[in-house]
């Protein structure tokens, strides 16, 4: 049984507007009539560009990697709507995606709305079904700091690498952009393509012997002796 009363006035925050209608219906089917479901439409907070930081990234490596976070101007209207609804709700349920990015997104929403632990719960579900959401409501929790740190570290590394190396790559080799994953992935593709282009076909043979015993046929492959195996 959930510790969240069905008589409570709830604000449920999801990521995508496409989920609002379905999640609203499921909550009402579960008996939560006083529910409002709103979408954050993705991240509400981003790293601010800052000329006084490393490569204008808004990241300060010399200050224990302090980050200049800022509310995304494109989300002002969304945030105002979330703030207004959170003020009249008994509880805010942060139902962003159940992964590290969803955890970071939810944590930034918690900070923007200035929610303390008595005002919100974090709920996680892996499918938008009545059963999954019911289970999530029976097991509400709070933000996972370690997942948040992991997501924010990913954002920091992405921006530091991209901002520092993209201008250089554009100037010297005409690359469109440089990224933490895309550049490493591209190198693997290029290395593999070079192997294919440089491949020289060689003939080799396999030696098989067929045996018959008691009208049953056996086929064996010669792979060498106990001391030395045949390469080809």
What are these regions (language model features)?
Residues 1-155, 161-164, 223-230:
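Intrinsically disordered, low-complexity regulatory segments
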Residues 158-226:
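Prokaryote-biased recognition of long, low-complexity C-terminal linker/tail segments
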């Amino acid at each position: 049984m959930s510790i969240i009363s069905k008589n409570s006035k709830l604000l449920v925050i999801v990521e995508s507007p496409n989920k609002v209608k379905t999640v609203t219906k499921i909550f009402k089917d579960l008996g939560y009539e006083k529910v409002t479901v709103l979408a954050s439409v993705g991240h509400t907070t981003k790293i601010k560009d800052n000329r006084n930081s490393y490569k204008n990234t808004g990241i300060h490596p010399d200050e224990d990697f302090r980050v200049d976070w800022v509310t995304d101007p494109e989300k002002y209207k969304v945030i105002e709507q979330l703030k207004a609804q959170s003020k009249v709700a008994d509880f805010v349920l942060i139902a962003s995606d159940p992964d590290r990015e969803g955890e970071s997104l939810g944590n930034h929403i918690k900070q923007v709305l200035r929610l303390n632990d008595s005002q919100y719960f974090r709920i996680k579900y892996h499918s938008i079904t009545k059963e999954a959401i019911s289970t999530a409501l029976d097991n509400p929790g709070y933000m996972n700091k370690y997942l948040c740190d992991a997501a924010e570290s990913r954002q920091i590394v992405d921006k530091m690498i991209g901002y520092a190396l993209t201008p250089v790559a554009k100037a010297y080799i005409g690359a469109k952009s440089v990224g933490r994953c895309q550049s490493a992935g591209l190198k693997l593709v290029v290395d593999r393509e070079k192997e294919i282009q440089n491949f020289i076909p060689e003939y080799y043979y396999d030696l098989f012997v067929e045996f018959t015993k008691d009208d049953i046929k056996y086929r064996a492959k010669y792979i060498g002796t106990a001391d030395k195996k045949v390469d080809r």
